[in-house]
Amino acid sequence: MLQDLHSHTYYSYCGGDRPEEIIEAAIAGGIELFGINDHVNGVITHVPEWDALGKDGWGSWVYDRMLHRYHDHIGLLREKYAGRIKILQGIELCTLPYALPLPEYLDISYFDYALIEHIDMKESI
């Protein structure tokens, strides 16, 4: 089975394509299992004003709202393309101390998988 479990869309700061575009490209390339796993720091754009609200303030609410919006969008596409390609919903987490910190309570269990980046770097947390 041909598969790709590391792809990014416009939800990531390093991707520019719509999710539909990369799914269509995967189908055209013969991929049968396709994972979309955008960077959590891209899905959730950091706004400096959130810092003043603390981790349990409005910024935390935005984390939840944006992650659920991303999850729901990919979920709709999973249904749309069922029978043509199997789509997994992932999220990519950064372990570097200077990255946008994740709230301690953050629940990502509803994703199919998570990729952890920079885990081999000395300064990784």
Predicted segments, located by residue:
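Conserved, mostly hydrophobic/aromatic
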Residues: H6, A26, A114
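Hydrophobic residues within beta-strands of alpha/beta enzymes
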Residues: F34-I36, A114
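Gly/lys/ser-thr-rich phosphate-binding loops in alpha/beta enzymes
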Residues: S7, S12-C14, I22, I85-I87, ...
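Short, acidic/polar
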Residues: G15-A25, P97-Y105
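Extended substrate/RNA-proximal surfaces in nucleic-acid metabolism proteins
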Residues: I44-I125
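Histidine-centered catalytic micro-motifs
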Residues: L2-S12, I36-N41
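Active-site mouth loops of central-metabolism enzymes
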Residues: L5-P19, E92-L96, S124-I125
